């Protein structure tokens, strides 16, 4: 019997009643991972021995009835540091890197007696939208194994969608939680910038990166955010705001809530069937008592261009630390220090990572800084101001998460511009540091469609309230891919 169909609260009740032990739950989770892994390829590392040791220790001291997460397995994206467990960022450059410390988000999970079951596959250094740039493998969509799972947190999304684990962590720099959540029909949240500590997250774009949760349902997603959100002196960008319970508004009605629907989010480049799905969702919100009105975010069309200048510039700086000297891959054909640097970085980084390093270095170079990086920062401010104007009158913004459903494997990985445009609807949220969630909202050609809800800073509770209200009157989150299996 698999437990992958049980909610976290149901699993907690079983653990407290001693109908199952943490060890049994961990063993069953490991079985679920193994039985599905060949089909989807969610994991880079499965930490079986460490997980079973931790489960045994939890059983020895007993499940804490007041701690919902006690004994619950957790999958962690492979750019989030885990002490004693390989953390590769899906790169040859870090193929053998074993951190000597835990990321704060992981430490918070351990403090709640969660069990890290393994590290999930991703695009190399989180640069990509399909989980095809990983050095190790290509992850496949849980619903259709000929399609991509999205990225960069593709493995974290498919691990939940395929029933391998109930909960996972990802990171989101330009849509890397929300896009794979949409493509796989699960719930993925990018919190407000600074809500979850970035300490221990392998940096890509430091002004954009944010760790966040994946789960099958809105409430479980909020329950995991309760665990990982915290202020942290180890992260200078950590926010002092801390909500006591992100589930506090779940179950409340949304009568009187004002929701904005940007016309730009339903314009050029958006699949007509995606547009129909979003408009149907808007009607559902109106039926629940909310007001939905069209607004404009005029500068959102510049988001992709702004993002790829800023994110690549930050990446070119952040990735300078990977040089083969102290840890990770080192080229064995180098004869002097210069060759160590050049050969290691040439051989250790994949094509997409090198492309972004070069783009960022160019944008920061003398003579081009003002025209590119400085200008991008100025347009970023205009995008932020657009959001501020809307949130002066509205509680939330509604739109599609992605312009299309999941695309085929090997169809866009040789066309970087087309791949970049897949993040058209998620990128502005990162540029503005806002919270955004993707929830299941329908299907097109048998593939899930994600609905995105965006709030002002620190409005995660309101986002969860609206998302849960929609979830309560729809059944999209209950539909599972064939691979999920298990008792229903």
Curated annotation (Swiss-Prot):
The keyword Lipoprotein does not apply. The active site is at 77 (charge relay system), 152 (charge relay system), 176 (acyl-ester intermediate). GO terms for molecular function: ATP binding; glutaminyl-tRNA synthase (glutamine-hydrolyzing) activity. Its EC number is 6.3.5.7. It is an enzyme of class 6 (ligase). Keywords: ATP-binding, Ligase, Nucleotide-binding, Protein biosynthesis. Belongs to the amidase family. GatA subfamily. This is Glutamyl-tRNA(Gln) amidotransferase subunit A.
């Amino acid at each position: 019997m698999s437990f992958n169909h049980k909610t976290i609260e149901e699993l907690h009740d079983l653990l407290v009643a001693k109908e199952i032990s943490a060890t049994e739950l961990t063993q069953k989770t490991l079985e679920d991972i193994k039985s599905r892994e060949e089909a989807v390829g969610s994991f880079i590392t499965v930490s079986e021995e460490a997980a079973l040791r931790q489960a045994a220790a939890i059983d020895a001291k007993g499940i804490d009835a007041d701690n919902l997460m006690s004994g619950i397995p957790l999958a962690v994206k492979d750019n989030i540091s885990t002490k004693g467990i390989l953390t590769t960022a899906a790169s040859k450059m870090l193929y053998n890197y074993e951190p000597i410390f835990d990321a704060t988000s992981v430490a918070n999970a351990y403090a709640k007696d969660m069990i890290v079951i393994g590290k999930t596959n991703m695009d190399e250094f989180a640069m990509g939208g399909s989980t095809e740039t990983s050095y190790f493998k290509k992850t496949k969509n849980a619903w259709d194994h000929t399609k991509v799972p999205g990225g960069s947190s593709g493995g974290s999304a498919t691990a939940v969608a395929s029933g391998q684990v109930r909960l996972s962590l990802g990171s989101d720099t330009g849509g890397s939680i929300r896009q794979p959540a949409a493509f796989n029909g699960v719930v993925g949240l990018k919190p407000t910038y600074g809500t979850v500590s970035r300490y221990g997250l392998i940096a890509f774009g430091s002004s954009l990166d944010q760790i966040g949760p994946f789960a099958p349902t809105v409430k479980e997603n909020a329950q995991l955010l309760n665990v990982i959100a915290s202020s942290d002196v180890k992260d200078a960008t950590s926010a002092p705001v801390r909500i006591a319970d992100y589930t506090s508004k779940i179950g409340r009605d949304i009568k009187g809530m004002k929701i904005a629907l940007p016309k730009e989010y339903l314009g050029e480049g958006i699949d007509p069937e995606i547009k129909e799905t979003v408009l149907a969702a808007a009607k559902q919100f109106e039926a629940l008592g909310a007001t939905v009105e069209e607004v404009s975010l005029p500068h959102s069309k510049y988001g992709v261009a702004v993002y790829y200048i800023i994110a690549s510039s930050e990446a070119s700086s952040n990735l300078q630390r990977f040089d083969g000297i102290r840890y990770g891959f080192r080229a064995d054909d180098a004869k002097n220090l210069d060759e160590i640097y050049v050969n290691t970085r040439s051989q250790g980084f994949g094509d997409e990572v090198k492309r972004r390093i070069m783009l960022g270095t160019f944008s920061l170079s003398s003579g081009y800084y003002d025209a590119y990086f400085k200008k991008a920062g100025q347009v970023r401010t205009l995008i932020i101001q657009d959001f501020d104007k809307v949130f002066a009158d509205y509680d939330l913004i509604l739109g599609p998460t992605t312009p299309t459903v999941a695309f085929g494997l090997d169809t866009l990985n040789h066309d970087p511009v087309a791949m970049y445009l897949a993040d058209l609807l998620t990128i502005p949220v990162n540029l503005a540091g806002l919270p955004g969630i993707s929830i299941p909202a329908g299907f097109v050609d048998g593939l899930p469609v994600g609905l995105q809800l965006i709030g002002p800073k620190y409005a995660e509770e309101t986002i969860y309230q609206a998302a849960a209200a929609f979830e309560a009157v729809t059944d999209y989150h209950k539909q599972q891919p064939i691979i999920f299996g298990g008792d229903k």
